[in-house]
Curated annotation (Swiss-Prot):
Acidic residues bias spans: 226-251
Domain of life: Eukaryota
PROSITE patterns according to UniProt: RIBOSOMAL_S2_1, RIBOSOMAL_S2_2
Protein name: Small ribosomal subunit protein uS2B
Region (Disordered), start-end ranges: 214-251
InterPro entries associated with the record: Ribosomal_uS2 (IPR001865), Ribosomal_uS2_CS (IPR018130), Ribosomal_uS2_euk (IPR027498), Ribosomal_uS2_euk/arc (IPR005707), Ribosomal_uS2_flav_dom_sf (IPR023591)
CDD domains: RPS2
Gene name of the record: RPS0B
Main location: cytoplasm
Listed Gene3D superfamilies: Glucose-6-phosphate isomerase like protein, domain 1
Organism: Vanderwaltozyma polyspora (strain ATCC 22028 / DSM 70294 / BCRC 21397 / CBS 2163 / NBRC 10782 / NRRL Y-8283 / UCD 57-17)
Length: 251
């Protein structure tokens, strides 16, 4: 698929894709994923062509931007590493997020509270999100999926080849997809200027690490405050001592 020059993969985005290990695929390859294989390493790991990944990101973004109501797009991830990315993607593009367990019947059983009628769904992993893909096929909802080289492609209309097991790879693909959607909608006018949002915002963060970091920051803040108080007390004592000496000398 040839893209206009405006949509070409920039060296900066290519470096991001490589740094996030988006190009590291599975050892096994499905038949429909063979065109996305760039090379095979000596250890058996297949390398994904990041150029193909970028082309599919742009194609998916054009499909998403073509839907008038952003809420008709449903972003889904039952995989833990993709839940934060799905929530951020939905916050920036206006899509409807389903982060966590997908309730069976959400697309087919109108009696359930979680019933939805989206015009398009985006899933993080065709395996873990198979229930959503299966129900979408029943009601003719197009499916965009982040697929590894060994991922099943049944009922998937647009497959974005990438490493859908790594937290950095998943977050970066969702980030690039959100950025391209905003550019196509006109929210980001100039393509030469970088987006103010950083890719780190889409990465999964371990709650225990977040709590530990907060405790460390609080400890550092407390230590700084204690040092400031001690310095203030020492300064006050020195001032009082100097005043006492001055009074004694005057007397």
């Amino acid at each position: 698929m040839s893209l206009p020059a405006t949509f070409d993969l920039t060296p900066e985005d290519a470096q991001l894709l490589l740094a996030a290990n988006t190009h590291l695929g599975a050892r096994n390859v499905q038949v429909h994923q063979e065109p996305y294989v760039f090379n095979t390493r000596p250890d058996g790991v297949n390398v994904i062509n990041v150029g193909k990944t970028w082309e599919k990101i742009v194609l998916a973004a054009r499909i998403i931007a073509a839907i008038p109501n952003p809420e008709d797009v449903c972003a889904i991830s039952s995989r833990t590493y993709g839940q934060r990315a799905v929530l951020k993607f939905s916050a920036h593009t206006g899509a409807t997020p389903i982060a966590g367990r997908f309730t069976p019947g959400s697309f087919t059983n109108y009696i359930t509270r979680s019933f939805k009628e989206p015009r398009l769904i985006i899933v993080t992993d065709p395996r873990s999100d198979f229930q959503a893909i299966k129900e979408a096929s029943y009601v003719n909802i197009p499916v965009i999926a982040l697929t590894d080289l060994d991922s099943p492609s049944e009922y998937v209309d647009v497959a974005i080849p990438c490493n859908n097991r790594g937290k950095h790879s998943i977050g970066l693909v969702w980030y690039l997809l959100a950025r391209e959607v905003l550019r196509l909608r006109g929210a980001l006018v100039d393509r030469t200027q970088p987006w103010a949002i950083m890719p780190d915002l889409y990465f999964y963060r371990n709650p225990e690490e977040v709590e530990q970091q907060a405790v460390e920051e609080a400890s550092a803040t407390g230590a700084t405050e204690e040092a400031t108080e001690e310095a203030t007390e020492e300064t006050t004592e020195a001032t009082e001592w100097a005043e006492d000496n001055t009074e004694n000398a005057t007397w």
